[in-house]
């Protein structure tokens, strides 16, 4: 199950489509009945979360928070992905991308972090990007890189 919390009340975002797309990606990744929360926030909230949890006092597009539920419950709960739609919009304009496609990409990127993927070193980054490209292609979104 994918839950979208659109706390900024951005009516341009089709929450239903985003939720369904991410649910299909979860199935594609063999995560079955996993639960995922996507929280759409403003710049103030993402900057505060980035400062508190990553000790970086700056804006970012997406943050991922793994579930802190007990291990026996945790299998089905992926965690939370927090996305700043203002940053994603700016990036989509700068990179000449569709806002909805870039938003979907950032949600998938955050979800992959919850599944253990990272991009700290070049090898891991390439593996994560390749998986993102493959997933995005299956849902009709061109290579974002």
UniProtKB/Swiss-Prot annotation:
- List the disulfide bonds in this chain: none
Q: GO CC annotations?
A: cytoplasm
Grouped into one coarse class, the protein's main location is cytoplasm
Pfam families for this protein: YbeY
Q: Which SUPFAM superfamilies match?
A: Metalloproteases ('zincins'), catalytic domain
Q: What are the record keywords, sorted? A: Cytoplasm, Endonuclease, Hydrolase, Metal-binding, Nuclease, Ribosome biogenesis, rRNA processing, Zinc
Localization, per the record, is: Cytoplasm
Q: Which InterPro entries match?
A: MetalPrtase_cat_dom_sf_prd, YbeY, YbeY_CS
Note whether Hydrolase occurs among the keywords. yes
Question: GO molecular function: any one?
Answer: RNA endonuclease activity
Q: How is the cofactor bound?
A: Binds 1 zinc ion.
Q: Where does Zn(2+) bind?
A: 109, 113, 119
Which cofactor does this sequence's record say it needs? Zn(2+)
Q: Which PROSITE patterns match?
A: UPF0054
- EC number(s) recorded for this UniProt protein: 3.1.-.-
BP terms from Gene Ontology? rRNA processing
Q: What is this enzyme's class at the first EC digit?
A: hydrolase
Outline what the protein does.
Single strand-specific metallo-endoribonuclease involved in late-stage 70S ribosome quality control and in maturation of the 3' terminus of the 16S rRNA.
The record's listing under PANTHER family reads: ENDORIBONUCLEASE YBEY, CHLOROPLASTIC
Q: Which family does it belong to?
A: Belongs to the endoribonuclease YbeY family.
Name of protein: Endoribonuclease YbeY
Name of the gene encoding the protein in the UniProt record: ybeY
